[in-house]
Design a protein with these regions (language model features):
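Short, basic/aromatic recognition patches
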Residues: 9-26
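Conserved hydrophobic/aromatic pocket- or pore-lining residues that grip, position, or stack substrates
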Residues: 16, 34, 41
Length: 145
C-alpha cells in the first residue's frame, strides 16, 4: 500500500476519474470506472465502463491504445477501481492487463465487492505486475489536482 500520491499520479488518476464520468447513467448498478494508460510520462490511451455488458475501463483503454497505434506493453495503468478478477458479462480485467503486458497498475480504490476485493491486486502481483493500491486515501484527494 502506498502512502501518498505523487503529482503525476494525481494528474493521471484525475484524468481516469474524468474518463469514468463518461459512463454515468449507463452502467448502473455497476460503478463508474475509468482507466488511463501512461507510457514514458505520456497518456497513450483512456477507457471507461461505457455500458452494461460492454468493455470495462481497462479493456477499453487497451483497445484504444492499439487502435491508435500504441502498444500497451510496458505501460502503467491508472485505474479508479481495483481490476476485476472474475467472469461476469465480460472476462476479467486482470487477464486483459496481463495479456497486454502492462507493467504497473495504480489503483485508487479497492473494489467494494467482496468477490473481488484484494483478489485483483493479488493476481496482478503474482503475475509480476507491480500493483499499488491507495486504499487508505479518499477519492477527493485525487480531485484536488
Amino acid at each position: 500500500m502506498a502512502t501518498a500520491w505523487s503529482t503525476d499520479e494525481r494528474k493521471f488518476m484525475h484524468r481516469a476519474l474524468m474518463a469514468a464520468e463518461r459512463g454515468r447513467g449507463r452502467v448502473s448498478p455497476n460503478p463508474l470506472v475509468g482507466c488511463v494508460l501512461v507510457k514514458e510520462g505520456q497518456v497513450i490511451a483512456e477507457g471507461w465502463h461505457d455500458h452494461l455488458g460492454g468493455l470495462h475501463a481497462e479493456q477499453m483503454a487497451i483497445h484504444d491504445a492499439e487502435t491508435n497505434g500504441f502498444s500497451p506493453n510496458g505501460a502503467t495503468a491508472y485505474v479508479t477501481l481495483e481490476p476485476c478478477n472474475h467472469f461476469g458479462r465480460t472476462p476479467p480485467c486482470t487477464e486483459a492487463l496481463m495479456w497486454a503486458g502492462i507493467k504497473e497498475v495504480i489503483v485508487a480504490h479497492p473494489d467494494p465487492n467482496p468477490t473481488v476485493r484484494g483478489a485483483g491486486i493479488e493476481v496482478l502481483e503474482k503475475a509480476g505486475i507491480h500493483a499499488v493500491s491507495y486504499t487508505h486515501l479518499t477519492l477527493p484527494t485525487i480531485y484536488s489536482v
